[in-house]
Amino acid sequence: MRILFMGTPDIAAECLKALYAAGHEICGVYTRRDKPVGRKQVLTAPPVKEVALEHGTPVFQPRTLRDGSEDANIRALAPDLIVVVAYGCILPKSVLEAPKYGCINLHVSLLPKYRGSAPVQWAVLNGDTETGVSIMQMDEGLDTGDVLVCEKIAIGPEETSGELFDRVTAVGARVLCEAVPAMEAGTLKPQPQQHENATLAPMLDKELAEFRLTDTAAHIHNWVRGMNPWPMAWFATAGGKKVKVTECRVAASDGEAPGTVLSTKPLTVACADGAVQLLHVVPEGKKPMDGTSFAAGLRLKAGDTL
């Protein structure tokens, strides 16, 4: 089966590697354009492009597919199937209908839950105990196509989005490689999504990453896990300083007011319904440190307000 692959970030690169390793014929790769990265704004290729070039596969980086400018090229590549993993461009009807087997997409949630760009993060932010991966037959909607395959994945109670994403990537690559031959054999049974149960997983940003010590312990704990590694959960101290929290644990309190320091070893602070241990933090303008060192730097003691 001739596969045209479309994807951009690390998860897509891992899936492309898996397809190569499984012996599939990749007739071409579409990815987003190179972009400036870092403080020096070095023009950097997407991870998928690097993998494709290592295998000598033609790479295409159009600004868009929606204007029809790539239709002729896609037809010339003559793919039997288009595989999409976090490409970042909308596929028009002309592209969706070009291959014999259409287009399939790996989505890292149990559809119809968490449609959108940040499904792994929102599963953690919401305190879910499981998520999964879905292989979907693409249509013109946003993650609305029939589900061909899905597999559940448990979420650890202390697992961060970054840690979970690594596991989801590995499972997704495996499930994708299993789905391709099954699709060719005609053994997959499309299951329409229950659209009335759909939820969205919008992009994260630094403003959304804020929590308050007046929030519940569970909310703070989930926010810290879900916003790690980016954009990192943060709160503002009583003095107005921004503090990122990279690791915390839920703890008990005796009903002290939110923001009250209960202990400095480890740094434990009361919140709405209990307390949280702030184990690792990044104070504004400073390097990462453990919570105890942060407390020492501020000369905090039990009973103070953070």
Predicted regions and their residues:
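Active-site-lining helix/loop region of Rossmann-like oxidoreductase modules
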Residues: 178-237
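Internal alpha/beta domain cores that form substrate/cofactor-binding pockets in large enzymes
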Residues: 2-4, 25-30, 55-77, 82, ...
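N-terminal beta-loop-helix "entrance" segment that forms/cooperates
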Residues: 35-55
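An anion-binding loop in the catalytic cleft
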Residues: 213-306
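Structural motif corresponding to alpha-helix initiation and N-cap regions
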Residues: 13, 42-45, 67-71, 117
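Donor/substrate-binding cores of folate-linked one-carbon enzymes
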Residues: 22, 32, 81-200
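N-terminal Rossmann-like dinucleotide-binding module
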Residues: 1-39
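A residue-level signal for conserved active-site and pocket-lining positions in enzyme catalytic cores
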Residues: 7, 29, 52, 82, ...
